[in-house]
Regions:
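Short, conserved charged micro-motifs
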Residues: 21-26, 76-80, 129-134, 210-215, ...
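Short amphipathic beta-strand starts and helix->beta connectors
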Residues: 1-2, 43-57, 108-112, 188, ...
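Glycine-rich, small/acidic residue-mixed loop/short-helix segments
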Residues: 167-173, 189-277
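Acidic, proline/glycine-enriched N-terminal capping motif
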Residues: 1-55, 64
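Short, conserved active-site entrance elements at the starts or edges of catalytic domains
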Residues: 138, 144-170, 207
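Acidic, low-complexity central loop/insert segments
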Residues: 3-9, 13-16, 56-151
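A common structural junction motif
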Residues: 33-34, 83-91, 133-141, 219-224, ...
Length: 277
């Protein structure tokens, strides 16, 4: 068996949600179904605005009578505040888990839970005594994630700007289409049933090193998307796939920061909206 690579993820924090009403509260507001934790160790989910856009994305694991949420560290305090707004009189305690750290491993290391977003991504572990930070391992983890086409909030899209389908929640087991209502559910359900998500995050390969997140992606002189994270010549970009298909039919390629790039054909074929030619 291949030894697992393990990387401390210092950009991740942990929020603890506990108490007898913890499950009821979370299940009423997040995109995924907590009952999945009856048969798997972790779920991926988001908390949306009433307009259906992603405010936070996180992993959820059981913790006694409550749950731990593995979230971007710079979003942890905001998540605590947002969850507290929905708490009202529910018997729930919400706080950052002081000292908790998150590790990623690939393949999944002993003591870790499988990352629910992709079968080849590996595992995650919340720990009070994690491995030491290794910049090389951290970069290797994100290169692995990018190669598999798995986006991450704050690195591939800005929180508050995109819908779950645009960030591939429907592809990464991040949203339930069978559970009851949650915040933003009507918009997400409508987009799913109509198949009209025009913007999607896809893998791209470039002629040279790719520019930073947010750099415009151009088809000729027309902006059709924005760059996300990258590792060398490979990266993730959010593209208007209907426009990209249109321009590709005219022989117009893509550039980003002056660098030529090619989107992954399999991603485009799988994710292009039903209305695209």
């Amino acid at each position: 068996m291949t030894d697992a690579q393990i990387a401390l993820l210092p950009d991740r924090g942990v929020v603890q949600v506990s108490g007898e009403d913890a499950r009821k509260l979370l299940d009423s507001i997040i995109t995924n179904d907590l009952s999945l934790l009856d048969k798997q160790d972790a779920i991926f989910a988001g908390l949306l605005s009433p307009q259906g856009k992603i405010l936070f994305d996180f992993f959820v694991v059981r913790d006694g009578d409550g749950f731990l949420l593995d979230v971007a560290r710079d979003q942890a305090a905001g998540l605590v505040k947002r969850l507290s707004l929905y708490k009202l009189r529910a018997k729930v305690a919400i706080a950052e888990a002081v000292g908790a750290q998150v590790e990623a491993s690939w393949p999944t290391a002993a003591g870790s839970v499988a990352d629910p977003r992709h079968g080849e991504l590996g595992g995650r572990r919340i720990s009070q005594s994690p491995v030491a930070f290794d910049p090389g391992a951290f970069e290797a983890y994100h290169a692995h994630r990018i190669a598999l086409g798995v986006p991450e909030g704050g690195k591939d899209y800005a929180f508050g700007d995109v819908f779950p389908h645009e960030a591939l929640f429907d592809q990464l087991s991040g949203v339930s289409f069978t559970k009851g209502c949650y915040v933003g559910q009507e918009i997400v359900a409508r987009m799913e049933h109509r198949g009209t998500a025009r913007k999607r995050i896809v893998r791209v390969t470039a002629d040279g090193a790719l520019p930073v997140m947010g750099t415009d992606v151009l088809a000729g002189e027309v902006v059709i998307g924005a760059m996300g994270s990258s590792a060398g010549v490979r990266g993730l970009a959010m593209l208007r796939l209907d426009r990209m298909v249109e321009f590709a039919g005219k022989g117009v390629g893509l550039t980003c920061g002056g660098v030529r790039m090619v989107p992954d054909a399999g991603d485009v074929a799988r994710l292009a909206p039903k209305t695209a030619g």
